[in-house]
Each structure stands twice: as structure tokens, then as C-alpha cells.
Amino acid sequence: MSAQADYDAIILGAGGAGLMCAAVAGQNGRRVLLIDHADQPGKKILISGGGRCNFTNLGVAPDRYLSANPHFAKSALRRYTAQDFIALVDRHRIAWHEKTLGQLFCDGSARQIVAMLMEECAKGAVRIALGQPVRDVAHADGRFRVTHGDRTASAPSLVIATGGPSIPKMGATGFAYELARRFGLKVVEPRPALVPLTLGGEETLFRELSGVAAEVIARTGKASFREAALFTHKGLSGPAILQVSSYWRPGQPVTIDFLPSRDSGWAVAAKRERPRTHFHTLIGEAVPGRLAEVLAKRIGLWGELANLPDRKLEEAERRLSAWAFNPSGTEGFAKAEVTAGGIAAAELSSQTMEARKEPGLYAIGEGVDVTGWLGGYNFQWAWAAGWAAGQAIGGAA
């Protein structure tokens, strides 16, 4: 084993948060070592946004993040905003566009974002060790000692930025939680978030709709999202479903308004105006035909509107505006875009991300109990948390 190398900070995890933290601390004059077990940095960045990286959102606000401590993310998000990251992207002359709902994407490739962050790390003379699994972490005499590969490094500051277990095929693990617990930090039970929901046997009729999508309002508890929902061979997916999945708990129903643009009384009004129109045809004016037929069958109304009682049409309206599904579960971490739960926010300073119980230990990014909406919110949390920790380590917080 080679001799121990000394640094001011060791950062574990070269994802979005780790890269940002390393760059900021390095540019503040700190000697930084960034370690990752993967053979390339920013692997989740590279696959995000269909390869174009949905790198932030113009609508970022604290109430669009979930946490057992809902106020925790406010400070970091206020101090490093979406506009700050956009300015960084612009300085690197990366072309971008707004797609929908404030979501910003690269015109070119997600590789541009990774290259930008690597260039920022280079400006701070950050040493990056890739393909280096962490074998041991110890703490004594005010320094953290990390054994990685066949090497040992030491620093007074250690940053946990290894993410959560979502998308394990990318090498994601629960290492952050294991390390946090070792240092006495509490962990909020991790669970898949922004994840497709599965449906049980009683919903088999909907499986024939695999691949069919429609704009809906999906609700669970107090959460409500108007976006596309997609039927799959296992259940429900699409942006609206991924959004509510973060709020869903086993046993809770998910209700869907299949006709969010229709006013109350639309079916009875159509009967007066177009009595010869078939009920499933009427629904099909707002949703795909296959979905319209299945919904009409499940409701039990078929035929011309003229032959259907007003009372039945009113009941159908109510059901179509709040169709209840009882998910049997989710598709798990393998299909989850992010992880909810994680290192308890109450254990950390919201200003610096430093552990209250363990000076010099920091936690940032997906491994912390802060989970954003779909659409660039989680990357903005990564940038903001990484920036806050980097500033603190650099003495500029």
C-alpha cells in the first residue's frame, strides 16, 4: 500500500453534487480529492433527460421538495439558484432550451454538463480518483482516513455524496446510509420515488392498454399533478404518475381525472346536443379511442347517449373525474429515478450540510432526505447542496 496522501477535503461520489462540491471547494483554495467507484464521473447525469440532461427547472421552490424536515432545503436553494446554474452553463457556452413546465435541457448532450463540471474541478486543481471503491473509512485525531483501492487518503473534511440506491444498474448503492449510520446519523427509511406504480389483478382490464397515454390529473393525498399518464403492462407510469408516486404510500388510492378539460355536466349537455353519439365515442373525443372503450366498459355504459339516463351519465362523469386505482406497489429502485428518504436532514446544518454531531462530516445530494419533483428539481438540489458544502469547506460560507 502506498503512503498516505493528505488533503483538506475528501469527497465520496462523483455525481452532480460531488462534482459541484469539489469544484467550489477547490476553487476556494482547498486541496480536494474526489473518489468514485465508477470508471467515469456523472453517470446519472449522462442518462438523464434522454441523454440531454434536464439540468434545472425555472419553477424551483422549496415546496416542490419532499423531506421529513420540509424547511431544510430552503437555505441552499435560495443561496444557489437555478439562475446561478444557468449562468454557469452560459459561461461554458452550452446551448439549452426550455421544453415544458420550466424544464431546461441541453440542445446537445448531457456530456456537456459533465465536461463543464470536470472543467470546473480542473480549475480548482481537484484530484479525481475513478474506479476506486472505498474499502474503509476511519476517523481519529480530527481527520478522516479513507482507504480506496490500494491507497489511503486523509483530510479534516469528508463529504458523503454517493447518492441513493435508485437505478442500481448504474452502480448505485446504499453506501451513503451505511456510512452515515456508522457516524451516528439517523436515516429516514429510503424508498423509491419518481417511480412507476404497479396494479394488482383486479385491474387486469387496463393491461390491454399498455402503451396508451393521456393527459390527466393524478392525485394521492393532497398531491395533484396535471401531466401525461401512461398505461404499462405492469400498471401506471408517465410524468403524472411518477410525480404522485413520491407522495404515495402503500394502501393509499391514486385517483385520476381522465377528462380534466371537461366542465361539470358535459355528458348530459352532449346528450341534448348530439343524442345519437355513442358514449364511448364521446369519451374518445378527449382520450385515445382504446382507453375510451375500456373506460366505457368498466363503467357499464354503452350505446347512444339518447338511450342512457341522465343519472347514469352524471355518475359516469363523477367516476371519470376521480377514477380510483389501488396500486399494489411500485417497480422499485430499479425503475425509480430518485430515492426518497435518506440521511435525516435534522442531522445536518441547512447552511453548510455539515453533520451537527460530527464536525467535518458533510452529506449532500440524493443521499440526503430531500427529494424534488420530476423535471430538473433534483439536479438543482444537487447543485445547491454541493455549492453550500463546497463554500463551507472553502471557508466562504
Model-assigned labels for residue ranges:
Residues 130-143:
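A conserved short coil-to-beta-strand element within the FAD-binding core of flavoproteins
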Residues 26-50:
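Glycine-rich FAD pyrophosphate-binding loop
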Residues 39-41, 46-47, 55-62, 95, ...:
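An anion/pyrophosphate-binding glycine-rich loop and adjacent beta-alpha core
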Residues 5-7, 148-157, 225-226:
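Core beta-strand elements of the Rossmann-like FAD/NAD(P) dinucleotide-binding domain
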Residues 10-12, 35, 134, 153-169, ...:
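Short hydrophobic core segments
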Residues 50-98:
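Glycine-rich active-site loop/strand segments that organize a redox cofactor
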Residues 7-34, 389-394:
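N-terminal Rossmann-like FAD-binding beta1-loop-alpha1 element of flavoenzymes
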Residues 130, 294-371:
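A glycine-rich dinucleotide-binding beta-alpha-beta segment and adjacent secondary-structure elements
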